[in-house]
Amino acid sequence: MFVSYKWLEDYVDLKGMDPAVLAEKITRAGIEVEGIEYKGEGIKGVVIGHVLEREQHPNADKLNKCLVDIGAEAPVQIICGAPNVDKGQKVAVATVGAVLPGNFKIKKAKLRGEESNGMICSLQELGIESKLVAKEYAEGIFVFPNDAETGSDALAALQLDDAILELGLTPNRADAMNMLGVAYEVAAILDTEVKLPQTDYPAASEQASDYISVKIEDQEANPLYTAKIIKNVTIAPSPLWMQTKLMNAGIRPHNNVVDITNFVLLEYGQPLHAFDYDRFGSKEVVVRKAAENEMIVTLDDQERKLSADHLVITNGTKAQAVAGVMGGAESEVQEDTKTILLEAAYFNGQKVRKASKDLGLRSESSVRFEKGIDPARVRLAAERAAQLIHLYAGGEVLAGTVEEDHLTIEANNIHVSADKVSSVLGLTISKEELISIYKRLGFTVGEADDLLVVTVPSRRGDITIEEDLIEEAARLYGYDNIPSTLPETAGTTGGLTPYQAKRRKVRRFLEGAGLSQAITYSLTNEKKATAFAIEKSLNTVLALPMSEERSILRHSLVPNLLDSVSYNLARQTDSVALYEVGSVFLTKEEDTKPVETERVAGAVTGLWRKQLWQGEKKPVDFFVVKGIVEGLLDKLNVLDSIEFVQSERKQLHPGRTANILLNGSLIGFIGQVHPSLEKELDIKETYVFELDLHALLAAETAPLVYTAIPKYPSVTRDIALVTDKTVTSGQLESVIKEAGGKLLKEVTVFDVYEGEHMEEGKKSVAFSLQYVNPEQTLTEEEVTKAHSKVLKALEDTYQAVLRG
C-alpha cells in the first residue's frame, strides 16, 4: 500500500511531522513501513510557464520555437520537440540551471541555429513512470489547467514535493488498504481525530428508481448491490489534484468519472464501477452466475470465457461486468457518455478470487474484495463518488439509491478486563488507560461489572477475540514502553490432554501388535494426492513447489506408506508392517484454507508368523489386518459401534475391501491393494487400512463395565459353512451373534477356502463359536439348542449350510 504524506494530511493533522518520524511511529505500532520515496528528490528549478507564442522552427520540421512566460522579467525562447505544444498552454519548464532526474542539468543551448533557454518538460522527464501518465500526454508534454499560476513551483502543482510511504501490510490488515484506514491508524498513534470527507450534494427531483431496478439471484455471492443514476455528466480530464494523487498511488488517470471511482477506491477501500447507462442496454440490473462458456469482452479489450462459478452483472440478458473483477467494454464510459449507472456492492471475496484466478485477471477491485472490505462503507463510498461526479463532471444525481440488501452487519462486542491485559502484557494498566486506547482506535467502549465491553467497527475485521484487543492495547501503549519482566503465571502440572493420551494409546497398541511407526512426507504428487482418500477433497497446490513430486498436500496416508513398503521390499525385507499417525489436508471449496485432520493408517505385507517358535508360518491376509483394526477399535472402546461393510474402491481389490462405519458414518476402510497397483509398485500382496483418528477419538464411548471371569467352563463348536462368494464373513458373523443368544460369548473366523472341490460361485467360511453360561455349567442340550438356532438362521438368511 502506497500512502501519500500530503494526501494523508487531508484526514489527519500531522503537525508538520517529518515523514521519516511518522514512518518510525507507524512501524513501532505494528505496521511496517518498508520504505519512503521522496517524489521529486534532486529536482529543482522547474516552474509553470505560459506559452505566449509558438511557431515552426525555421531549420527543423519536428521542432517548435516557443516564447514562454516563466514569471521572470521577460519571456524566454525555448525550442521544444513535443508534438502537442501550442500557444496559450501552461506547461512545466525546466529553467536554465535546473536539475532533472539523473542529475541532468539544463543549460543555454543552440538547437539548429536557434537559442533555447530551458526545456518544456513531459511528466516522464520529471521522473513519473510512463505507465502512470495519462494517454493524452504519453507522447508529449503535460499541460496544466489554465488557472495554474505562471512562475509557480511546478513540482508542488504536480505534488512531486510529496513523500510516499510504502506499507508492508500483513493479510489480516485489509482495513489499512485505503487512505481512511491508514488515517484511523495514524490518528490513533498520534492521539488525534480523523477528518472525514464530506458527501453532501444536491439531489435532482427525478427518482433513480424510475431508471433502474436491481435483482440479485445469488445472495450468498452478492448480499448487497446498490445503484445510483447520475445524468448530464460531461466527460473531461479530472482535476489536477486528483490526477496527481492517483499517480502517486500508482494509478494512471483516465477521465473524471473513472478517476473518481478509482479515487474513492483508494480513499474508502470500496471498489466502484461506473457503467454508461445508455450503453448498458436495459433498465434493470440482474446479478447472476454466468452461463457455462458465456463470453464477455472486458475493459482491457480481451474476450474472456466464463464459467458457472463466476458472478456477472447483467442487463437482464447479457453480461456487462465480471462482478468484483472488471467491467465490460460494451458499457464502458466514453467521451460521449451522458448518464452514469454507478455500482457499489458487497461481493463474496472467495467468489471474486475464484473468478480473478480463473480469468488471470487481477485488479485493484478484486484484491480488495479478496482481502475483505468494510460492509458499512458500501453506501458511503457511493455517496462520496456521487458528490465528486456532481462537482467535477457536472452530473445531476437522481434522488434515492436503488438496491437489494441481504447483508447483515452484526455488532462485534468483545469483553476484556484491565487485569487480563495487565497480566498478559506484564505491566499495570488501568481501566481508564485502556478505555482511552480503545477510543483512540475509534472503538466504542462500555462497561459491565469489572469488564469493558468493546464494540469494534466493521472496518476492523481482524479483531474478533479478547486476545486481539490485548494486542491492540499493546500496540498503542507502545511495545517499547512495556517493561522487561518475567511472565507471571501460576504453576501448572505437566500432562497430556485426553486427545493426546488416546493418540499415544493408538501408537502403543499398533506397535504392540507388531507394526513399526513410519513418518512420511505430507506433500505428494497429483496422481497420489487423491488416491485412497476416505472422502473427496479438492487439491491444495503449493505455489512454488521444490518439485512436482512434492507439490500437493496429501489427502491420505496410504500412498506414501505403500512407497515405504516398496522401498523396503526392494532391499530384501520380505515382511513389512508399518503404521503412521499423521495429518491429511482436505479442501471442500476452491480458494478456501484446507482443513488439517489426523488419520492413522497401516500397510502390512509378507508373513505374519515367520519364526518356527511362533508356530506354523502364516502369510498376511485380510483377516489378520482386520483383527489388528478390531483390536485397536476395541482398545478405544468403540468396537460395539463399528460396522464393516463390503465396498469397492478404485485402488483396492474388489472382493477384499470394506468400509468402516462408526455409528453409520464412514470413518475409514480396510482392504487389499489392487493387484494392478501392486504390480505397478512392484510389491507383493499387501493389505492397508486408514481411519479418521479425529472422529475415532472424539466418539462418545460407553463406560467400561466390569464383568467377572466365568466360573463355569465354556463349550466351543467349530463350523465350516458353504455359502455364496458374495456373502461376507461379517454378514455371517452378524447372523450368528443375533441367533446365538445370551449363551454365545465369542465368534471367531479362522478359515476361508475357495479352492478345489468347491462349487462354482461358492466358498467355505469357518467359525469358532464359544458358548458359556456365567451362572451354571452348560448342558449338552443347552448348547445343542443354541447351536441349532444359529445353523437354522444361517440357512434361512444366506442359504449357508454345513460343509460336508
Swiss-Prot record:
What does UniProt give as GO cellular component?
Answer: phenylalanine-tRNA ligase complex
Positions that bind Mg(2+): D462, D468, E471, E472
Q: Which Pfam families match?
A: B3_4 (PF03483), B5 (PF03484), FDX-ACB (PF03147), tRNA_bind (PF01588), tRNA_synthFbeta (PF17759)
User: So which domain of life are we looking at?
Assistant: Bacteria
Record keywords: tRNA-binding included?
Answer: yes
List locations, semicolon-separated: Cytoplasm
Q: Which cofactor does this sequence's record say it needs?
A: Mg(2+)
| EC number from the UniProt entry | 6.1.1.20
Q: Which reaction does it catalyse?
A: tRNA(Phe) + L-phenylalanine + ATP = L-phenylalanyl-tRNA(Phe) + AMP + diphosphate + H(+)
Q: What class of enzyme is it?
A: ligase
Domain (B5) spans 409-484
Under the heading PANTHER family, the entry gives: PHENYLALANINE--TRNA LIGASE BETA SUBUNIT, PHENYLALANYL-TRNA SYNTHETASE BETA CHAIN AND LEUCINE-RICH REPEAT-CONTAINING PROTEIN 47
Q: Which family does it belong to?
A: Belongs to the phenylalanyl-tRNA synthetase beta subunit family. Type 1 subfamily.
The protein, known as: Phenylalanine--tRNA ligase beta subunit
